[in-house]
């Protein structure tokens, strides 16, 4: 069997991006600079009216060869301009809109985007996929945040990779509902409910919402050189409804993903900023109600080691699972094909590699790039008719470049 090679288009993209890297002096990470939306509530911002503009422009190429998912490209941007007013030192109100545009696309399916959307011919928007944005952010104490409306969601939750894919930042709608965050020296707790699909009487689809809990414990002393952390995470998704009596599909469905693990970061005594990192997690899947998915229970184990050098991060990992299905994660971490749910993988195993670079460009501006490899080891596929097929090693690649801007303009102070 021929050795899989990186596609020439990806090689050219990576070479061009690497030549653009400036000299770096401090450590940075792609998720914190490019994917995470910053809080805009300021203790000294009482009486301020501001215009805040957040934008992520991206080009991501997925050269996928796995049995789990086919390849595709995401070229485009999303833009979220909002007006914010802070009537109190601990309360901020925001209103605006979210607009998603893919280069070369003129019509957009008019539905909730929970990943790369499926085409719905008769229900479309033109030019952009547009949604209203409203957020009420209340901070009753220094450590507690309560958010209603548009949440600080997606990558802000800090979910582990088998449970949540950072690519959702490029294709999914802002999360909306309610959120509570509690932060102390030893723990960060983030709990939220995201209402994904609302139904009216006699609607033809199901309501859908998700509940999440992301906890990160930090048992190490502040002065300790090696810092440990313990992620404990939970995700539920429910689909159902009582007033949609004419819907074709009325089966109630409830699914669970959970993860626990341990990780560390160890800075080294070197002339340039260098740190070693590691993380091991165990993940679970459970079909609490319904029969839509082929498995009722499953689990997966993921371990990875890495290094942070300047503004770069490199990681290598190993994943294996049994009947595991990820609700919001990269499909490579699942044991079922998202293109054909009747095709299942028997105890799949995978090697992963990750390289990233991220840097601030100034206040409110940052950019980054990443490259990922998913090497699925030989695996047995089971099809709907009961036949089996042995599939050899499949190597998938993904690479992207991103520009994140989030400037804030003071319009008036009362």
Over which residues does each language-model region extend?
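Outer membrane beta-barrel transmembrane domains
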Residues: 158-162, 290-295, 299, 306, ...
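Short loop/turn motifs that connect adjacent beta-strands in outer-membrane beta-barrel proteins
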Residues: 30-49, 85-93, 142-143, 186, ...
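Outer-membrane beta-barrel "beta-signal"
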Residues: 393-414
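Surface-exposed strand-loop-strand hairpins of Gram-negative outer-membrane beta-barrel proteins
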Residues: 54-78, 108-110, 121-122, 388
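Surface-exposed coil loops of outer-membrane beta-barrel proteins
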Residues: 145-216
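Surface-exposed loop and membrane-interface regions of Gram-negative outer-membrane beta-barrel proteins
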Residues: 91-140, 161-162
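Transmembrane beta-strands of outer-membrane beta-barrel pores
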Residues: 53-61, 97-103, 150-155, 184, ...
């Amino acid at each position: 069997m021929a050795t899989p090679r990186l596609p020439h288009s990806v090689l050219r993209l990576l070479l061009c991006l690497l030549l653009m890297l400036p000299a770096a002096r401090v450590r940075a990470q792609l998720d914190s600079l490019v994917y995470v939306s910053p809080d805009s509530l300021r203790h000294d911002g009482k009486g301020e009216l501001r215009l805040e503009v957040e934008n992520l422009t991206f080009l991501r190429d997925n050269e996928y060869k796995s049995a789990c998912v086919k390849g595709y490209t995401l070229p485009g941007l999303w833009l979220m301009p909002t007006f914010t007013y802070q009537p109190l030192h601990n309360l901020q109100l925001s209103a605006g809109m979210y607009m998603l545009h893919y280069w070369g696309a003129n019509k957009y399916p008019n539905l909730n985007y929970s990943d790369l959307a499926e085409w719905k011919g008769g229900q479309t928007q033109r030019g952009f996929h547009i949604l209203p944005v409203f957020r009420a952010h209340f901070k009753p104490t220094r450590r507690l945040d309560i958010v209603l409306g548009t949440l600080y969601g997606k990558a802000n939750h800090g979910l582990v990779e088998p449970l949540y894919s950072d690519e959702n930042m490029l294709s999914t709608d802002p999360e909306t509902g309610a959120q509570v965050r509690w932060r102390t020296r030893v723990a960060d707790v983030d709990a939220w409910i995201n209402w994904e699909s609302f139904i009216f009487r006699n609607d033809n689809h199901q309501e859908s919402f998700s509940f999440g809990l992301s906890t990160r414990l930090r048992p190490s002393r502040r002065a300790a050189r090696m810092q440990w952390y313990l992620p404990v995470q939970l995700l539920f998704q429910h689909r159902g409804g009582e007033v949609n009596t004419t819907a074709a599909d009325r089966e109630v469905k409830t699914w669970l993903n959970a993860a626990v693990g341990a990780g560390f970061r160890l800075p080294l005594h070197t002339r340039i900023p260098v740190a070693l990192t590691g993380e091991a997690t165990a993940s679970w899947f459970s079909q609490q109600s319904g029969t839509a998915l082929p498995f009722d229970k499953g689990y997966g184990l993921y371990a990875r080691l890495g290094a942070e050098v300047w503004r770069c991060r490199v990681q290598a990992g190993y994943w294996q699972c049994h009947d595991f299905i990820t609700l919001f994660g990269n499909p490579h971490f699942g044991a079922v094909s998202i293109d054909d749910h009747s095709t299942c993988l028997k105890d799949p195993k995978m090697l992963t590699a990750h390289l990233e670079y991220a840097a601030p460009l100034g206040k409110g501006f940052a950019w980054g790039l990443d490259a990922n490899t998913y090497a699925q080891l030989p695996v047995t596929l089971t099809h709907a008719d009961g036949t089996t097929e042995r599939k050899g090693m499949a190597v998938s690649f993904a690479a992207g470049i991103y520009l994140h801007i989030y400037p804030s303009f003071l319009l008036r102070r009362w």
